[in-house]
Amino acid sequence: MLLASLSDLLPGGERLLAEAVAALGLPGVSVRVSEQMVQGIRTRRVEVLEEAPQPLRHLKDLTDIVAAAPEKHWPADVKEQGLAALTRLAEAESTVHGEPLEHIHFHEVGAVDTVVDTLGAVLLARATGASRVVASPVNLGSGFVTFSHGRFPVPAPASAELARGMLTFAADSGMELATPTGLAVLKTLADGYGPLPQGSILALGYGSGTYSTGAYPTFLRAYLIECGPRRARPNADDASTEDACAEADDAGPTRGRGNLFGPHGHSHSWPNAHMSSGRTFTKDEEQGGHSHGPHGTHGHEHD
């Protein structure tokens, strides 16, 4: 939902994402962007499509794919951050399973989805223009999750490992609200944690997935916010004294001098994050659920 909300927030985000995914050179892989109603609210959904099952891929395979991607579509800093998130994901699995990093492979069902979710979110976050990302506390959820290694209490082992150093909490949701992939991306993008920044909302993006609880809206909302002046200024037209902030309710980052703000005290899986660079991008987690399938489809398995 982070990817979907960012593509909705950013003008031209849908086209930017589609062209970038095509440039990855993965045979038969594309994205489909559509709109769907979630409890009466229009949201955007992004699906990763594969014409044929992709082979199991280790981290080195993914590194090679990203390295070969043309910088016209995948700037060097996007590649660097994307690979950092994928590496975090693999390292978490390596730690919890006690396996060497080179033995960790991305699940055959979720490998391509994970790559597109991760790199796409970083790309769109960069395109928004924010230079700093701040996240609100991450709701990890509660209850149990079942994947290839059995049934585990939430957060699953890899999620708990990834949550180290992040500001988290657990609401009585009875379900997993923060996936390993989502945590890896957020941890890579966020520079710190804090409340929703003060400012004027310029744009909103709503992202949803396939899961719905029926109890509360399952979407992630992203905001683009123009922050107030840093200091008193005699001339209201003097833009040099103000910041632009972007916030996202469970969404992603922004571009420029902004903040990316994630969930803030809500019952969803993503924390609020805002990037500062004149603009702030924020994302809210006031909705529950996430767009991935069972834990095994968005994490890794070991050989």
What is the predicted role of each segment?
Residues L16, A130-D237:
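Mobile "lid/hinge" segments at catalytic clefts and subdomain interfaces of large enzymes
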Residues V46, D113, L186:
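Divalent metal-coordination and catalytic microenvironments
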Residues S30, H103-H105, R132-V134:
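Residues at or immediately flanking beta-strands
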Residues M1-S7, F106-G129:
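Conserved phosphate/anionic-ligand binding catalytic regions in large, soluble enzymes, centered on
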Residues T95-F106, V115:
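Non-catalytic, charge-rich alpha-helical accessory subdomains
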Residues L83-A84, E102-G110:
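Short, glycine/charge-rich beta-strand/loop segments that flank catalytic centers
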Residues D8-H97, A156-S159, R164-F169, S173-L183, ...:
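Glycine-rich nucleotide/cofactor/substrate-binding loop typically near the N-terminus or early
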